[in-house]
């Protein structure tokens, strides 16, 4: 057992002790009753709606907003977070802060109470149950965690989380040279479920199809993706390579809306997670506007997520009560291809929790050369720059990285922020 195994096993044990058991044994049984019973669903959300002081909508349909009046967005929270943070009470006495930079590179800190973390785990667990997973089953994890020092340990870039029976694999070391190592590790572990970034599992799947390699594990029931937009072409590639259905989970650090995929591929808006309304954007696209039911420490109402969905009028054959959308149009980060062939997707972890970063952008110049562009806050120090470079090297290995302080980061022609910018021809 290496140090990474000890670290992640202890982390899982402590999380299970604090929130996991409560989520699975108390919250999950209650919310599972909402799936096929409109009456149970209405009964569950009614007290939540009363507390948020909004009217009760049809729980099985999505309401459309006439205008953006009365909505809030990320900028409002960043500028005045204290106005959204609630005073301490008995129910919110235990709280913590979670940080994200998302697709904008602008660090955002959300205060959440312990009950929020417990309920979040319960809702995610319900999604995993839809995919055929039960607690204790073998699971593989291919996301943004630093689980390797850059060298394979017993042939794999990763470690075992013994407490949760999980094979933790690095999403930063996948390349044409290492893909077979990953597949061999998956075959030996033979997981029931794989949880992954779409870009990470897609890198393996596309290599498998290009090299006519079949997945040889015989227990895999499903792959659950999250944290990035899952394109349909990417989903089809993954399903073809691994021979199982891909389930996708949509959520955000603000905890105002969630969408889960069922066994028929329907994208269900979980109306027992938060109150979701639709704000017309363009053509047939609508922005998700959510009101949190779960977080009592930081109440967010009518929050514009910035993520778009396309509606449909079909009834999902699974029979669940939750309304569906056709597709989710969220973040589309570029992928960086390093000199050794590794493809790197999400790097927003670099800026998480960086209080002195107003905005951040990752620029790749080719040949393992990075520029980390930063709009710095007034308390910026040299140590902040050193920490950013250290975080980058922890994830992608030893590369050349420089921090560039700028007054602003230009938007593209469409006015959108480009979190990962590739300037290899510069």
Give, region by region, the residue ranges found by the protein language model.
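Short, hinge-like loop/turn segments at secondary-structure boundaries
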Residues: 157-158, 212-215, 264-268
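Adenylate-forming
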Residues: 171-178, 191-235, 248-253
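AMP-binding/adenylate-forming catalytic core of the ANL superfamily
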Residues: 194, 284, 296-399
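Conserved AMP-binding/adenylate-forming
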Residues: 221, 225, 230-315, 332
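AMP-binding/adenylate-forming
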Residues: 118, 140-200
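Conserved beta-strand elements of the Class I
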Residues: 138-140, 289
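Short hydrophobic/charged patches on amphipathic alpha-helices used for structural packing
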Residues: 180-183, 187, 212, 348-351
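Nucleotide 5′-phosphate-binding alpha/beta core
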Residues: 1-99, 105-138, 145, 188-195, ...
């Amino acid at each position: 057992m290496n140090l990474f195994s000890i670290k992640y096993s202890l982390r899982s044990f402590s999380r299970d002790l604090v929130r996991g058991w409560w989520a699975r044994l108390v919250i999950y049984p209650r919310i599972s009753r909402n799936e096929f019973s409109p009456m149970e669903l209405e009964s569950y959300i009614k007290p939540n709606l009363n507390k948020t002081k909004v009217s009760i909508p049809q729980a099985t349909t999505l309401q459309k907003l006439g205008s953006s009046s009365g909505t809030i967005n990320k900028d409002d929270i960043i500028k005045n977070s204290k106005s959204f943070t609630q005073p301490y009470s008995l129910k919110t006495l235990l709280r913590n802060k979670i940080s994200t930079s998302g697709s904008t590179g602008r660090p955002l800190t959300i205060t959440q109470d312990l009950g929020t973390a417990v309920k979040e785990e319960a809702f995610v667990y319900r999604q995993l149950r839809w995919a055929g997973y039960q607690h204790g089953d073998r699971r593989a994890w291919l996301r943004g965690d630093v689980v390797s020092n850059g060298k394979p340990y017993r042939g794999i870039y990763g470690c075992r989380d013994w407490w949760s029976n999980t094979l933790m694999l690095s999403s930063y070391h996948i390349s044409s040279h290492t893909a077979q190592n990953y597949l061999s590790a998956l075959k030996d572990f033979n997981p029931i479920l794989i949880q992954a970034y779409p870009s990470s599992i897609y890198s393996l799947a596309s290599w498998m199809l290009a090299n006519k390699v079949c997945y040889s594990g015989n227990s895999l029931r499903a792959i659950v993706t999250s944290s990035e937009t899952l394109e349909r072409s990417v989903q089809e590639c993954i399903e073809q390579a691994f021979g199982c259905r891909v389930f996708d989970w949509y959520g955000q650090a603000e905890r105002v809306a969630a969408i889960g995929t069922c066994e028929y591929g329907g994208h269900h808006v979980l109306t027992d997670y938060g109150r979701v309304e639709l704000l017309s954007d363009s053509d047939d696209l609508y922005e998700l506007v959510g009101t949190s039911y779960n977080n009592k420490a930081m109440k967010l109402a009518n929050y514009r997520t910035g993520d778009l969905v396309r509606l449909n009028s079909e009834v999902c054959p699974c029979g669940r009560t939750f309304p569906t959308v056709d597709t989710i149009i969220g973040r589309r980060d570029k992928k960086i291809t390093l000199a050794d062939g590794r493809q790197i997707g999400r790097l927003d972890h670099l800026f998480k929790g960086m209080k002195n970063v107003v905005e951040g952008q990752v620029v790749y110049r080719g040949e393992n050369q990075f520029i980390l562009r930063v709009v710095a806050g007034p308390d910026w120090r040299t140590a902040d720059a050193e920490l950013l470079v250290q975080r980058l090297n922890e994830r992608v290995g030893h590369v050349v990285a420089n921090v560039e302080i700028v007054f602003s980061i230009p938007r593209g022609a469409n006015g959108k922020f480009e979190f990962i910018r590739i300037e290899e021809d510069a």
